[in-house]
Design a protein with these regions (language model features):
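N-terminal secretory signal peptides that target proteins for export/translocation
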Residues: 1-6
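Bacterial N-terminal signal peptides
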Residues: 9-21
Length: 199
């Protein structure tokens, strides 16, 4: 009888030794899956601007006068170089704008917030090298289109500003800026960039 109980006890231990690691492995896989899901969720938008990394030629079109019913456009060329920072959570563009008679340089800095899943964008250029830095534009990408909004002033009046990134391919993309003087009811596009990759 004692021998039978001993054998039964040993068999139980053997069975548990086989089952428990399987349960532990399954639990570990579930935990790992949850962690990966959380990481994916937190970083799902962090690669939105990867398409822009590299060196580009830019054809610019800018309205000569903004919010003045102007239909006269100024066209000029330029360059753009973009690189990622902070492991992809930020990136910076260095732009050369070959405006006839008044060329200048500009810097666009972007930073990704994993909590809100939004990008913030700041602009500074050599016409005002000591600032102030423009108020940030904030937004996201959806269905291949990046849409960003911000509050600003133009000629002393409050406006809403909007950036759009569209027509994104490995070798080209399109950007435009628009202002609204009436809280977004109407928009005037005042700056357009057609961007073509150099390398």
């Amino acid at each position: 009888m004692k021998t039978y109980r001993c054998r039964a006890y040993i068999m139980t231990l053997l069975t548990l030794s086989l089952v428990i690691p399987g349960v532990s492995a399954a639990q570990s896989n579930q935990d790992s899956g949850r962690r990966m899901s959380q990481i994916d969720s937190a970083t799902s938008g962090v690669h939105d601007f990867d398409f822009l990394v590299g060196h580009w030629r830019v054809h610019h079109r800018k309205l000569k006068e903004r919010l003045a019913n102007s239909h006269e456009w100024i066209e000029f060329e330029g360059t753009l170089s973009s690189q990622p920072l902070m492991g992809g959570y930020s990136n910076v563009d260095d732009l050369v704008l070959e405006v006839p008679g008044v060329p200048y340089r500009g810097v666009a800095l972007r930073s990704f917030d994993s909590k809100t899943q939004q990008w913030s964008i700041w602009w500074l250029d050599s016409r005002r090298p000591l600032g102030p830095v423009d108020p940030p534009m904030r937004g996201t990408f959806k269905d291949g289109v990046g849409t960003f909004y911000g509050n600003d002033t133009y000629n002393g009046r409050p406006i809403r500003a909007r950036f759009l990134w569209t027509k994104i391919t490995p070798t080209s993309c399109h950007w435009e800026q628009a202002y609204s003087p009436d809280e977004g009811k109407t928009w005037e596009t005042n700056w357009v960039q057609d961007i073509t990759r150099v390398h």
